[in-house]
Amino acid sequence: MMEEVKRVAEKLTGVGRPSAAEARKLIRRREPENFLFEDDGKTPNNPAFPLVLYRDAVGLPDEFDPAAVIEEIFGANGWGKGWRNGIFDFLHFHTQTHEVLGIASGEARVQFGGVQGRILTVKTGDVVVLPAGTGHQRIAPAQGLLVVGAYPPQGKYDQPKPGEASEQARQLIAHVPAPVTDPVYGTGGPLMACWRDRRD
């Protein structure tokens, strides 16, 4: 029944959901850009793990729903509980889970790391992996922006705002373990080297 519904939807929209094999072929090997942000007193950020940015990591051909491509890649690598939306225009962070953002369409200027962090422009095909505690906020309206978010299996979603970065929040962040897979490249992905647990 679901396959029939899928075929009808694909016929109506002209775009489809890729198979796991098709999605794998759309992954582009990229060197990560790393950004380690310090606690600024309001946004805790992560003391051990840097934000990892893969530029143009996913090819998004017209034949497939771009968000479905990214969902398939993240899901195949064990990152789930996904959503489709934009990026909030207020500064926030998560204390009990890491998060990955895949840009399915459009572009946006995003402040990462709190008010003393960095403003980065993210575009279609980019993937950003945010360690627990990393502040993030879209700072300007974004035309056509569609983001796919997902989380590793361990962890719990929460959404404190700056000023709520208590000592308890910092303790929670410090205890979120490194994920076992890179959301784009799997077990051997660059994230695994970038996020070697430096707490030991």
Q: Where do the model's predicted regions map?
A:
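Double-stranded beta-helix
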Residues: 139-200
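Short, conserved beta-strand element in jelly-roll/cupin
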Residues: 94-111, 129
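Short, solvent-exposed loop/turn segments at secondary-structure junctions
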Residues: 110-111, 118-120, 137-138
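A short, N-terminal "cap"/entry segment at the start of jelly-roll beta-barrel domains
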Residues: 3-91, 192-200
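Short, flexible loop/turn elements at secondary-structure junctions
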Residues: 58, 104-105, 114-116, 134
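Short, surface-exposed beta-strand-loop junctions and turns on beta-sheet-rich folds
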Residues: 116-118, 144
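Conserved metal-binding segment of the jelly-roll/cupin
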Residues: 122-142, 151
